Amino acid sequence: MKKLIFLFAFSIAVTNIFAQTDPNQIKKEGNDAFNAKNYPVAYAKFSEYLKQTNNQDSATAYYCGIAADEVKKYAEAVTFFDIAIQKKFNTGNAYARKALALDALKKTDEYVATLEEGLKVDPNNKTMIKNYGLHYLKAGLAAQKAGKAEEAEECFKKVIPLDHKSYKTNALYSLGVLCYNDGANIL
C-alpha cells in the first residue's frame, strides 16, 4: 500500500513538472489580458512568458513593464523597461516609462539620469521633454525660494535648450526675475 501511494504521488509530481504550458499560449493570454486592460493578469502572464524564454522578447518585456507599472510594481517595471532599452525596442518610450517608474519609487537622481540618457537617444520625445523640463523648473523655483540663486540659475538653464515653448518661456522669465532680484539686492 505504501508503495502504491508513493508511486501515485511520484507520478503526479512528474506530470506537474513536465506539464509546462506552451510559452506562445502564455504570451497570447497575456496579450488578451493586456488588450482587455486586465493588467494584473497581463503582468503575470508576460512575466511568466519572459522567464520561460529567458527575456528574449523585447516587445513583450516593454508591455510587461507597462502592465507592471499599472499594477504599481515599479521596480519590476524598471527591470522590464531596461530589457526593452537594451534590445532597442521602442527606446524613447521605454526610457520615458522607466523614468516615470523611477519617479514613483522616489529615486530622483536615477529619474533625472534616465531622462538625460533618454533625451540623448530620442531628443524629440515629448514625454521626456515635459518631465525633464518640469523637474528642473520645480527644482529651480524651490532653490529660488530657498535663496539659492546659483542653484536656481543652473536649473533654469537646463530647461532652455528643450524644445518646449512654454517651459522655455518660464525658464527665461525665471532667469530674468533672478537677475532683477540680484540687481535689487545690490542697490
Q: Model-derived features: where do they sit?
A:
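N-terminal leader/linker segments that initiate helical-solenoid repeat arrays
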Residues: 2, 17-63, 70-75
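Short coil turns that delineate tetratricopeptide repeat
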Residues: 54-55, 89, 123, 164-166
